[in-house]
């Protein structure tokens, strides 16, 4: 796992791209809980998202799960690969399975997220 990733308690990860944008996906732990992903309901580019609010839905053979925005901003790119290959979330949760890229409205929100070590400790306690 990339140690530069930040995590929300709701199991989303955030990668700071260094240009005012972040990439968002769901963690390895989350995809393991979901099981085989069969569909991802992607938002539209230019949609505004608010930290803590649902912006996407991932359906698996076990359940449908809302995906929550770990930070606020405007969606600038969606991972269209997920439309035909939703299983990328299972196979590469931190690489090809990313969900959206967002232009942050407030970069300080990143400080509210856990680092990789804190996140791993929290899921091991579950």
Curated annotation (Swiss-Prot):
Gene Ontology cellular component terms for the protein in this record: cytosol; glycine cleavage complex
Domain of life of the organism encoding this protein: Bacteria
Cofactors: (R)-lipoate
Coiled coil: none
Cofactor note: Binds 1 lipoyl cofactor covalently.
UniProt keyword annotations, A-Z: Lipoyl
Gene3D superfamilies listed in its UniProt record: 2.40.50.100
Pfam families for the chain: GCV_H
Disulphide linkage map: none
Domain Lipoyl-binding, chain residue ranges per copy: 21-103
Presence of the UniProt keyword Protease in the record: no
An annotated GO BP: glycine decarboxylation via glycine cleavage system
Modified residues (N6-lipoyllysine): 62
Purpose: The glycine cleavage system catalyzes the degradation of glycine. The H protein shuttles the methylamine group of glycine from the P protein to the T protein.
Family matches, as NCBIfam families: gcvH, PRK01202.1
Similarity annotation: Belongs to the GcvH family.
UniProt cross-references to PANTHER family, sorted A to Z: GLYCINE CLEAVAGE SYSTEM H PROTEIN, GLYCINE CLEAVAGE SYSTEM H PROTEIN-RELATED
Subunit annotation: The glycine cleavage system is composed of four proteins: P, T, L and H.
Protein name: Glycine cleavage system H protein
């Amino acid at each position: 796992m990339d140690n530069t990733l930040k995590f929300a308690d709701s199991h989303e990860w955030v990668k700071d791209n260094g240009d005012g944008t972040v990439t968002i996906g769901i963690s390895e732990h989350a995809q393991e809980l979901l099981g085989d992903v069969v569909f991802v309901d992607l938002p539209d580019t230019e949609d505004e998202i608010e930290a803590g609010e649902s912006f996407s839905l991932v359906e698996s053979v076990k359940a449908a799960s809302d995906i929550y925005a770990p930070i606020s901003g405007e969606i600038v790119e969606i991972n269209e690969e997920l439309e035909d290959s939703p299983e990328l979330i299972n196979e590469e949760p931190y690489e090809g399975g990313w969900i959206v890229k967002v232009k942050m409205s407030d970069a300080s929100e990143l400080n509210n997220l856990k680092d990789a070590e804190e996140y791993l400790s929290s899921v091991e306690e579950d």
